[in-house]
Regions:
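Walker B catalytic acidic pair
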Residues: 130
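Predominantly extracellular/secreted Zn2+-dependent metalloproteases
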Residues: 1-124, 134-234
């Protein structure tokens, strides 16, 4: 039920490098569509629903709010509904000085997130961090920045989502998994971007090695590998 539009947020060619936002070019808008479609889809999966009912068991600790109050079972369920409820978002591209900017209806991310999100370990931290600002969470919660538990486990919303993405991507259970479909990172599309591509994302083999490394480190992957969902047919 999200209503999404795009904006330059006042950017013009004359504003200078210190401006908070960059031009919202079509190539970035297309990636936003992929990002939002995958994110919304993740929220409908059996794995998502299971983790939200068993968060501490799967992820090693609970989510907590701006007052550092851990979520109750009821809070997990009510937030599940709130996150997918009707809301307006204005999407943009932020300055490289930030990973992103978000709050209210504004949801902006920086250039590397537009091509990094396919790799799971890159992109989703900023994407979901800013989403949670739109959902009224601040930096005192672990909804924007994950935080270490006393046992040393990094727990938070951003950790959950990149791990869910890497699990579903490996299964082929996401609407969009192929970064070559739009080819944002490809040299022939450089003329349509206003950014360079980080070295790690320029070679498919190198990128896959990094994805595999993060896959092996994921608590969520380990949990569902050892405890497959009975109603999960894929």
């Amino acid at each position: 039920q999200w209503n999404c539009s795009f904006s330059n947020f006042g950017w013009t060619p004359t504003v200078g490098e210190s401006y908070n936002f960059r031009e919202m070019r079509p190539i970035y808008a297309r990636e936003w569509v992929v990002i939002l479609t995958n994110y919304a889809y993740m929220m409908t999966t059996p794995e998502y629903k299971y983790v939200m009912a068993n968060f501490k068991k799967v992820m090693g600790g609970d989510l907590y709010d701006n007052e550092k109050v851990p979520f109750t079972a009821e809070k997990y369920q009510s937030e599940m509904e709130r996150f997918k409820a009707k809301k307006n978002f204005v999407l943009g591209q932020t300055s490289p000085a930030y990973g992103g900017l978000g709050g209210g209806a504004t949801w902006g991310i920086t250039d590397w997130n537009f091509y990094g999100h396919y790799a799971s370990f890159s992109g989703w931290e900023s994407i979901t961090h800013e989403f949670m600002h739109c959902m009224d969470y601040g930096h005192n919660s672990n909804m924007t920045y994950a935080a270490k538990t006393p046992e040393g486990v990094n727990v938070g919303w951003t950790e959950f989502i990149w791990q869910l993405h890497i699990w579903l991507s490996k299964k082929g259970d996401l609407p969009y998994t192929d970064r070559n479909l739009l080819g944002f990172h490809k040299p022939e599309n450089a003329q349509y971007r206003d950014c360079d591509i980080m070295q790690i994302f320029q070679d498919d083999a190198v990128l896959q090695k990094n994805i595999d490394s993060f896959y092996k480190k994921s608590r969520l992957v380990k949990y569902f590998t050892e405890n497959p969902l009975k109603d999960n047919k894929k």
